[in-house]
Amino acid sequence: MCHKIEQLRSILDNSKYTVALCGSGMMEEGGFIGIKKQDKAYDIESRYGYCVEEMYSSAFYNTRPEQFFEFYKKEMLLRAPKDTATGSALAAMEQAGRLQCVIDSNIYDKAHRGGCRRVINLHGSIYENQCPRCKKKYSLTYILDAKRVPLCDECNVPVRPMISLIGEMVDSQNMTQTTEEITKSDTLLLLGTTMASEVFRQYIKYFSGRSLVIIHKAPHYSDKEATMVILDHPMNVLPLLGYEKKKQAESNASS
């Protein structure tokens, strides 16, 4: 592991433009079990009477808002992944000039909340909610505190979480920005995801840089195409690069 950490640090230190792609493994390291996982999906359907694909959809939000928000709050918000060391490690990398952009396929905004400034939340964020009619914005707390359906206090219609639900198109601006960032990257980090990812594979094909590094818990057949593979959770790897210690040392020196 020490040799790989040194090698990864060298790649990052010599990279002109580094982009990190954060996949579902980032949620798993925080204790979240994906709702599409077979056992989880079966459990949800047995408890709610509907499959995940039905409940986590715009059609369900529009036609059965009470059931949609019961599911959304219990399964997506109250079971949200815990913060891990990955968020602060990415922020330290960014501050050290070793990371130029984070592209997150998850909805929990962990990189941004960990301190990163340049983040593209490909599928939106649970922290962004608005009325579909008047566009008034509402906090996550407002959604959680609502007894049943969180309604706009101006229009009396259900507030819409600004996330991509199953079957919906990803925001076109996010898609364009993601493609542009990957195209100009010199180094691409795949964190908690693989080159065969349903979400990222359509973007990875635009990468023509020097180094593609995968940090993921489980091996995958597509790993052979990477420059380097580290089989572990990102939270166990990124802090070892030492950028957080460097950040702390610089902070102490300036105080």
Predicted regions and their residues:
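Conserved catalytic core of sirtuin-type NAD+-dependent deacylases
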Residues: 1-255
